[in-house]
């Protein structure tokens, strides 16, 4: 599939993820673009963050083969795409919890190595817990209201992060959002 001005965020994620995987490189989509995918674009991200421990030289080769140009550091832009691709350094984690397994989302454009909905919720809640960022809470709610998540895992992780009170706010917000979607 060719990258052009009509390529969606999900298609771009699949194209990049598939190219990396086929080159033997491991990188997992995280952050706001995962929320965009799992919220059916209720939240609109402007970049794709692939967390990786791979060497930049190896990433450069794959990204160049797709038509991307390195902007600075670990950022890439494609002349036909509105989205930037960034490669934050590993480790892949939510709060203090490392992530060792993730989702493989099959699409028409390829397979995306991506956080699970539960991991995405935890990723967004980590921002809410650390910085009291309401936008991160809203994004966690968007994902949890549309996809099954392991609420007991999120609860125990929240407790380990000393954030049981904010977790309860999240649970109430999800209940409210689900009732408004029905």
Residue ranges and their predicted role:
Residues 1-182:
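Compositionally biased terminal segments of proteins
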